[in-house]
Amino acid sequence: MKLELLIPTSLDEIPLKHYQEFRKTVDTSNDAEFISEKMVQLFCGIELKDVVKIKATDLSDMIDHFNRIFAVKQTFKHRFKIGDIEFGFIPNLEQISWGEYIDAEKYLSSWDNMHKAMAVLYRPIKNTKGDKYEIIDYEGTGEYAELMKFTPVSIAMGASVFFWTLGLELLEALGDYLEKETKKMSKTTTANKRSLGNSGDGISQSMQQLKEIFSTSIESQNSPLLKH
């Protein structure tokens, strides 16, 4: 019997839940052959037992294909649909609540929880006017987290990079502001110069640590899918 494969042409066609399972396989297995088989099983929607029926040259071509589509930089999208529900990204991140920010940062740190992160950042649109829209209030991830497993992985990658990049920009702006304020304060009194200098050093170190966290998170989104 001839084996039929539906090979995704872009990350728009791969649901988040399949990529999460693939990432889990990569993190827990050192068997390159098994990882390759799981990749084809998950992304092409076939049984694992059928993967061994594929010609070796074809499998190698498929690995190259998936590496290429995962290497494409994903653009950030404000809105997308799952079934009949249209979801919108938080319209103004500068007005994000503390609860939203803490949950988003926590869940974005692990692909296992990326569906929960999507349930924080994207919520059902309740009103639309032109290009503007309103989303429902944030009340935790319980209601939509499971549904978000069907988010195209392209949406998840674009949103996570956007969030971390914006966070890095905000940190840099805050760091510049604090540095200027520290210099102003150090000029007001000679007596406090040493203590203020130490405080400034501490602030700089903390900012640098946070920047490294944001930068590492962004880089992890762009790592190669699979080597062979």
Predicted regions and their residues:
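Charged interaction scaffolds used for protein-protein
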Residues: 1-228
